[in-house]
């Protein structure tokens, strides 16, 4: 079966709002993280080839839970983490979903890597670098995806790619992927990288 066909068999399992509601799987998990409004939902819909799998919104900070999606029955679990950095939610709500994120990332036995999205239109913010440093300190592997590349010039894209190369990171997985959910650029490459990670 072709990789895109495998990824398109996507089933929403649960939106977990507390640790006890995390599903108990024994298959590979790959998490998607990023700053609020970076395009996580659009990317999930693009790689699963279904605009309805993840709700998209122009309002930052909409995802306040961890969403679990089962791919192709037993191929893998795609984990949509809440966006960090901006939200009109209460401080208590924000603290809760940040705790959920941290608990999941530190305790999941099946997590292979985090796909970390960076809005290339905005570039790397301090909060992105803080999250990268946290992943590095906790020895969590991650792959960087530059999103919304259709909105910037090649020069700006190259500046961001070179910036990553100069960070001297230890747990980043290459290549850095440049993607546009709108035009499906880089989506095939990302699906391939996901499949390769699971096969290892």
UniProtKB/Swiss-Prot annotation:
Keyword Protein biosynthesis tagged = no
Cofactor or coenzyme needed: Mg(2+)
Named from the GO MF annotations, one term is: GTP binding
The record, for PANTHER family, names: ENGB-TYPE G DOMAIN-CONTAINING PROTEIN, MSS1/TRME-RELATED GTP-BINDING PROTEIN
Q: Which Gene3D superfamilies does the protein's record reference?
A: P-loop containing nucleotide triphosphate hydrolases
Organism superkingdom? Bacteria
Q: Write the record's keywords in alphabetical order, separated by commas.
A: Cell cycle, Cell division, GTP-binding, Magnesium, Metal-binding, Nucleotide-binding, Septation
Native source species? Ehrlichia canis (strain Jake)
Q: What is this protein called?
A: Probable GTP-binding protein EngB
Q: Give the similarity note.
A: Belongs to the TRAFAC class TrmE-Era-EngA-EngB-Septin-like GTPase superfamily. EngB GTPase family.
User: Where on this chain does GTP bind?
Assistant: 34-41, 61-65, 80-83, 147-150, 176-179
């Amino acid at each position: 079966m072709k990789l895109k066909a495998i990824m398109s068999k996507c089933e929403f399992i649960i939106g977990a709002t507390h640790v006890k509601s995390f599903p108990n799987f024994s298959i590979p998990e790959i998490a998607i993280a990023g700053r609020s409004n970076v395009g996580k939902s659009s990317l999930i819909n693009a790689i699963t080839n279904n605009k309805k799998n993840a709700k998209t919104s122009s309002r930052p900070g909409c995802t306040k839970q961890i969403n679990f999606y089962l791919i192709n029955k037993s191929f893998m679990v795609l984990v949509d983490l809440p966006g960090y950095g901006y939200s009109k939610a209460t401080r208590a709500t924000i603290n809760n979903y940040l705790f959920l994120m941290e608990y999941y990332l530190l305790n999941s036995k099946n997590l292979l890597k985090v796909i970390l999205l960076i809005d290339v239109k905005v570039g790397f913010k301090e909060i992105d670098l803080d999250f990268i440093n946290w992943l590095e300190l906790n020895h969590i592997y991650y792959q960087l995806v530059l999103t919304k590349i259709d909105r910037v010039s090649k020069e700006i894209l190259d500046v961001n790619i070179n910036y990553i190369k100069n960070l001297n990171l230890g747990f980043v997985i290459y290549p850095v992927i440049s993607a546009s959910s709108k035009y499906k650029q880089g989506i095939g490459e990302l699906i391939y990288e996901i499949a390769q990670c699971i096969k290892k």
